[in-house]
Regions:
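Bacterial N-terminal signal peptides that target proteins for export
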Residues: 2-15
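C-terminal motif of bacterial Sec signal peptides marking the signal peptidase cleavage site
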Residues: 25-27
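ADP-ribose/NAD+-binding catalytic cleft of ART/PARP-like enzymes
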Residues: 31-115
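Short, flexible loop/turn elements at secondary-structure junctions
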Residues: 91, 114-121, 159-164
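N-terminal post-signal-peptidase region of extra-cytosolic proteins
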Residues: 101, 134-144
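Short active-site loop/helix that positions an aromatic residue
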Residues: 118-137
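Conserved NAD+-utilizing ADP-ribose enzyme module
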Residues: 141-265
Length: 265
């Protein structure tokens, strides 16, 4: 076959392109190119980011996990006269040394630590059934409402002074199972939480920054993390803030996969 005939045959093959079942098939390519309009992982995240900025009564949860003596699922300890509750936080490798301490220490971060409760993860353990280590870590990122590129792969479990905790919601009370979609009358401009933090200012600062930048997060403002997985019902894990200078005591630092396997035993 002459060079000209080979070229004509190749051109004809390229023209013989078929669209079958939403998949573009071409003799010019060895791979099928998907033309599906289904949202991608990032699109699900971006939709959650937009939705989270519009809290309303229909999104209010009545199933937030309370931090109270009545909640028998919680783990407590006492250091001196300080009552401390067990919480956890997903972290990166660079943060591990901060928690590798045998004694109590004070955290130092202006906006506080966002934390959750191991007991709350335990009641959601079914979310990880059948997943391998990679998929399970990704699922935890989704459930916490973190950004898709987040590289956190460790979990620090530690006790924190319970008097320094508040809920990052319109009602910052930690002993209830719900928060409204607007500030209660008693949460005025002078209301403080967690050892003197002006709550309304903290809240306004978060509204101005949480949804912006490379690490933007869909903060629901209602006491739970925004689970942005495609088939999730929006409500992730109950979340709390440990304020700057809170006293903490590390219990364990482990990989995400080890943490999850303990939940699913």
């Amino acid at each position: 076959m002459t060079t000209q005939k080979r070229l004509l045959s190749w051109t004809a093959a390229c023209a013989a392109t078929l669209l079958v079942g939403g998949v573009l098939l071409s003799a010019c390519h060895t791979k099928a190119v998907l033309t599906s309009t289904a949202p991608t992982t990032r699109q699900h995240y971006l939709m959650a980011l937009a939705d989270a900025q519009r809290p309303d009564p229909s999104k209010v949860s009545n199933d937030l996990m309370p931090v109270s003596d009545d909640n028998k699922a919680l783990e407590w300890t006492t250091v001196g006269d300080m009552k401390m509750v067990l919480v956890c936080k997903m972290i990166d490798q660079q943060t591990v040394p901060l928690f590798a301490r045998p004694d109590t220490f004070r955290i130092s971060t202006r906006s506080g630590y966002w934390v959750s409760l191991p007991a709350d993860w335990a009641r959601r353990a079914d979310q990880f059934q059948g997943l391998d280590s990679v998929a399970a870590r990704r699922r935890m990122v989704e459930m916490l409402g973190l950004w898709p590129e987040c590289d956190y792969d460790m979990v620090a479990t530690f006790y924190v002074d319970v008097s320094r905790l508040f809920r990052p919601a319109y009602d910052p009370t930690i002993t209830t199972t719900t928060s409204p979609a607007d500030f209660p009358a008693w949460v005025d401009e002078n209301y403080t939480v967690g050892g003197g933090v002006n709550f309304r200012k903290w809240f306004a600062d978060q509204q101005a920054s949480a949804y912006q930048g490379r690490k933007a997060c869909p903060w629901a403002q209602l006491g739970y993390s925004y689970d942005w997985h495609s088939n999730a019902p929006r409500q992730g894990i109950s979340e709390y803030i440990a304020t700057d200078k809170s006293v903490v005591l590390t219990k364990k630092v482990q990989g995400v996969w080890s943490f999850i396997k303990e939940l699913t035993k």
